[in-house]
Design a protein with these regions (language model features):
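Basic, glycine/lysine-rich polyanion-binding surfaces/domains
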Residues: 1-232
């Protein structure tokens, strides 16, 4: 991939799980490995979702989006994960929805700043930073070359692509995944569910585990591995 090019990526192999409601914050805090409080309108987070034995069911990129949280994960596990999360809702005032209607997302790599996309304000400059402009939510991802995730209403995304990205080179999801690998960002697919504890795929190194937060599903195993160096 030439770093001097601007590239747009097809991300159809990703899915979005939307979590919203009065108790959404508390609910997610009891399910994921990271502190959901860090996810704000200007900062996104990575997090794992474990089974009671501390094995990863999913790896999320979580974005605070309006009054909800968007959990981005592999499409191969999204339906199953939506069902599992819904099982934990019980009496909480929370709604869990897979691929909410009307929301669109796409990726871009800005290799040529001279032909950069036109926005009302500046692009996010540090990894995981979020900017909200031109009716879109824009997240900066890890990597030396600016790599961005765009989320918004479908019509806004399509208009933005037509206006700004018509000259971008189109690349597949495999190319997007390669950028994640180069940046040390893992993925969990259907074939790798329940195969790893979070530390085995470096979630601690990339800041996707908070060892000071309260309990969550699988937390005992994750903490024991951290403090004692091995799972039991």
């Amino acid at each position: 991939m030439q770093p001097t090019k601007n590239i747009i990526f097809d991300l159809k192999k990703l899915s979005i799980i939307k979590v919203e409601g009065e108790d959404a914050h508390t609910f997610l805090q009891g399910q994921i490995t990271n502190d959901i409080s860090i996810a704000t309108p200007t900062q996104s987070i990575h997090a794992g979702f474990c089974n009671p034995k501390g094995r990863l069911l999913a790896f999320f990129h979580i974005i605070k989006y309006l009054d909800s949280y968007l959990l981005i994960c592999s499409a191969s596990i999204a339906e199953n994960i939506t069902k599992k999360l819904s099982m934990y809702v019980l009496r909480s005032k929370v709604k869990v929805e897979l691929n909410p209607k009307g929301i669109m997302y796409f990726g871009a790599l800005i290799g040529n700043q001279d032909e950069c996309i036109s926005l009302e304000g500046k692009l996010p400059t540090t990894p995981m930073e979020v900017a909200n402009q031109s009716s879109l939510t824009i997240i900066r991802l890890h990597g030396d070359i600016p790599r961005l995730l765009f989320i918004g209403e479908k019509n806004d995304c399509l208009n933005f692509i037509e206006k700004n990205c018509s000259q971008f080179e189109e690349k597949s999801f495999n190319d997007w995944s390669l950028q994640n690998i180069k940046s040390g960002i893992p993925s969990i697919y259907n074939e790798t569910q329940e195969q790893f504890i979070p530390q085995s795929i470096n979630l601690d190194i990339i800041g996707a585990i908070n060892f000071k937060k309260g309990c969550y599903t699988g937390q005992e195993i994750v903490a024991r591995t951290h403090y004692l160096g091995k799972p039991k």
